[in-house]
């Protein structure tokens, strides 16, 4: 918990409001309450600002006149937000072995595991050797967690989970802000990873925690080896992700989606339910209609892509034909 006066000093902001107000955490601009801090990056979100119930908003001076609550006025909003997040970052306490506060039911724990404070592990779980489970993690029943897995602070795992060797759940997301000298400042990721029931996660997959809200993997999802899932991603029920797929930050995949091996989904892309992505494709825009999509430069409907591929393979013949036609026209 920090007062607005303390926060203003930390981020070098002009405080407009009560310096004694206490702030307990950070939330998105849509959901922040009177004890939480949020930020508004530009005038695109002015309607959100007008209706904000946040305890304080980081913003620039142009938006101050419509701010209904306490304000921290800065020139570089994103940089100030990045600095503010570190005030609310919970530090994991390193501990050797199993912390006495951990609640472990009928589970088998192999040697060399580290289990932190206030961890809860359900019935009939198997925790293999060299697994690290940090503070405040919750694991349901019948989980199989294989060697060298790391489940980091505050994450939640459902029932009937299989987590293969080398998986990292809850790693810090790739969020950074630049100052005037183009130096980078990291954003502390305050969200968690929440994984539902009946999920399988392949070896050496990494799932980043959310920036403010949680990264979510819903019931029945299947994830292959070497997949990277960035911060704030939501993967809905019964979707399947093949090996070496990269899913950028803040993407949302609908129910029953299938993503082929080696595909890339760039940040802030939404996929509707029942979408199939061909392996090695690059998805760089929202797909709102179910179907099979393929594309290695820009994504398109699969049937259209097949026609384009035929044209590309015969492009030299088409050019040769057109040159002959052009020559004949010139001779007339």
From Swiss-Prot:
Top-level taxon of origin: Bacteria
Family annotation (InterPro entries): Hexapep (IPR001451), LpxD (IPR007691), Trimer_LpxA-like_sf (IPR011004), UDP_GlcNAc_AcTrfase_non-rep (IPR020573)
Protein's name according to its UniProt entry: UDP-3-O-acylglucosamine N-acyltransferase
Active site as annotated: 231
E.C. numbers: 2.3.1.191
Family to which the UniProt record says this protein belongs: Belongs to the transferase hexapeptide repeat family. LpxD subfamily.
Pathway(s) this gene product operates in, as recorded in its UniProt entry: Bacterial outer membrane biogenesis; LPS lipid A biosynthesis
Quaternary structure (record): Homotrimer.
Reaction catalysed by this enzyme: a UDP-3-O-[(3R)-3-hydroxyacyl]-alpha-D-glucosamine + a (3R)-hydroxyacyl-[ACP] = a UDP-2-N,3-O-bis[(3R)-3-hydroxyacyl]-alpha-D-glucosamine + holo-[ACP] + H(+)
Protein function: Catalyzes the N-acylation of UDP-3-O-acylglucosamine using 3-hydroxyacyl-ACP as the acyl donor. Is involved in the biosynthesis of lipid A, a phosphorylated glycolipid that anchors the lipopolysaccharide to the outer membrane of the cell.
GO annotation (BP), single: lipid A biosynthetic process
Organism of provenance: Vesicomyosocius okutanii subsp. Calyptogena okutanii (strain HA)
Record keywords, A-Z: Acyltransferase, Lipid A biosynthesis, Lipid biosynthesis, Lipid metabolism, Repeat, Transferase
Record-linked NCBIfam families: lipid_A_lpxD, PRK00892.1
Gene3D superfamilies noted in UniProt: Hexapeptide repeat proteins (2.160.10.10), MurE/MurF, N-terminal domain (3.40.1390.10)
Coiled coil: none
GO cellular component: membrane
């Amino acid at each position: 918990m920090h007062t607005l006066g303390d926060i203003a000093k930390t981020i070098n902001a002009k405080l407009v409001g009560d310096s004694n107000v206490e702030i307990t955490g950070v939330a998105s601009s849509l959901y922040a309450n009177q004890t939480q801090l949020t930020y508004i990056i530009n005038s695109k979100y002015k309607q959100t600002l007008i209706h904000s119930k946040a305890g304080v908003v980081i913003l620039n001076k142009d938006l101050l006149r419509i701010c209904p609550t306490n304000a921290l006025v800065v020139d570089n909003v994103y940089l100030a937000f990045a600095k503010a997040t570190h005030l609310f970052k919970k530090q994991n306490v390193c501990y050797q072995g199993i912390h006495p506060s951990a609640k472990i039911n009928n589970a088998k724990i192999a040697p060399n595991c580290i289990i932190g404070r206030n961890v809860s592990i359900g019935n009939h779980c198997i925790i293999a050797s060299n697994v690290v489970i940090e503070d405040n993690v919750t694991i349901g029943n019948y989980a199989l967690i294989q060697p060298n897995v790391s489940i980091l602070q505050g994450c939640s795992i459902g029932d009937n989970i299989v987590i293969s060797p080398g998986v990292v759940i809850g790693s810090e997301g790739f969020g950074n802000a630049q100052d005037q000298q183009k130096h980078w400042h990291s954003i502390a990721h305050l969200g968690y990873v929440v994984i539902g029931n009946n999920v399988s996660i392949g070896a050496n997959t990494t799932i980043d925690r959310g920036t403010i809200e949680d990264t979510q993997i819903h019931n029945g999802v299947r994830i292959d080896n070497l997949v990277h899932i960035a911060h704030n991603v939501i993967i809905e029920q019964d979707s399947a992700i093949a090996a070496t797929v990269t899913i950028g930050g803040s993407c949302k995949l609908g129910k029953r989606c299938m993503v082929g091996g080696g595909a890339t989904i760039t940040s802030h892309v939404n996929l509707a339910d029942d979408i199939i992505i061909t392996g090695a494709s690059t998805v760089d825009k929202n797909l709102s209609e179910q179907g099979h999509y393929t594309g290695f430069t820009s994504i398109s409907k699969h049937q259209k892509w097949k026609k384009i591929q035929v044209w590309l393979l015969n492009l030299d013949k088409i050019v040769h034909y057109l040159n002959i036609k052009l020559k004949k026209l010139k001779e007339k």
